[in-house]
Amino acid sequence: MKSILIEKPNQLAIVEREIPTPSAGEVRVKVKLAGICGSDSHIYRGHNPFAKYPRVIGHEFFGVIDAVGEGVESARVGERVAVDPVVSCGHCYPCSIGKPNVCTTLAVLGVHADGGFSEYAVVPAKNAWKIPEAVADQYAVMIEPFTIAANVTGHGQPTENDTVLVYGAGPIGLTIVQVLKGVYNVKNVIVADRIDERLEKAKESGADWAINNSQTPLGEIFTEKGIKPTLIIDAACHPSILKEAVTLASPAARIVLMGFSSEPSEVIQQGITGKELSIFSSRLNANKFPIVIDWLSKGLIKPEKLITHTFDFQHVADAISLFEQDQKHCCKVLLTFSE
């Protein structure tokens, strides 16, 4: 089989490997589609602090089970599945309270362990989620990005009457917008970004107001309009955003952070405590695959609005370059694998 391997930062190769055999409790997935994420680019370029090399990247992937290991029902062969990349121990403190995404021995497929940019992938059977026949392949491969939005909104608990500010109209920001509008029916969703084309995408995904904040600070715009967001979600992940979010937020608001920067964020306790703000962080997803599969089955989210490009997996280097360089027109890039 062929696999996409990052041998070391900035060194990508398509290599020939033996087709793996699933061990006890595992299934083998013949991969059909995979999605490129920012973290794949970061691993490729050497900017992900958690990655170990050499590494087969890819944590968004979909395919068909073609073999099972001991202890897995043979009836699962032939199942269409999307794979949850979060592999956890199941018994540490985070796992015991429903947060396998921060397991003390967390392994993320495509980061800590080999992922799905390969013609075949062996994964824990419990991580392979069956996809209803009514859900198309290209939607199924988008489940993992939407689980990020499910995790974020699980923390933020949006209501219809919230005024929500989403920083960032990249792929994750747009999944969050779709969930806010399609699942939670939030009446007022504001998106801030510095690229007009991305803001247009935000409108297509349901944003009520899309603001280019490259020239005028959000504080000025919101003061003029009398707006105080009750929920702020940082999908741009810059360390400067927390300070601004605390200033902009309504009293009793919630703020959800997703960034992994090692740079400090300057924030004053008085700004947080004076308004009794609730600040959450969100990493990966905590058992959100069934939730997103249900949303897809009910037509509450529209993954097709985010897919802009598709490449054969053997052109992955071109696909990643496009993803990195064309932020105006490129949103979600899919890789196809041989039938």
UniProtKB/Swiss-Prot annotation:
Keyword Translocase part of the UniProt annotation: no
One annotated GO molecular function: zinc ion binding
Residues the record lists as binding Zn(2+) 1: 37, 59, 144
Residues that hold Zn(2+) 2 according to the record: 89, 92, 95, 103
Superkingdom of origin: Bacteria
One Pfam assignment: ADH_zinc_N
EC number: 1.1.1.-
Note on cofactor: Binds 2 Zn(2+) ions per subunit.
Annotated PROSITE patterns: ADH_ZINC
InterPro entries the UniProt entry points to: ADH-like_C (IPR013149), ADH-like_N (IPR013154), ADH_Zn_CS (IPR002328), GroES-like_sf (IPR011032), NAD(P)-bd_dom_sf (IPR036291), Zn_alcohol_dh (IPR050129)
CDD domains: Zn_ADH7
Induction of expression: Repressed by RspR.
Record key words, sorted: Metal-binding, Oxidoreductase, Zinc
NCBIfam families: PRK10083.1
Protein name, as recorded: Starvation-sensing protein RspB
Gene behind the chain: rspB
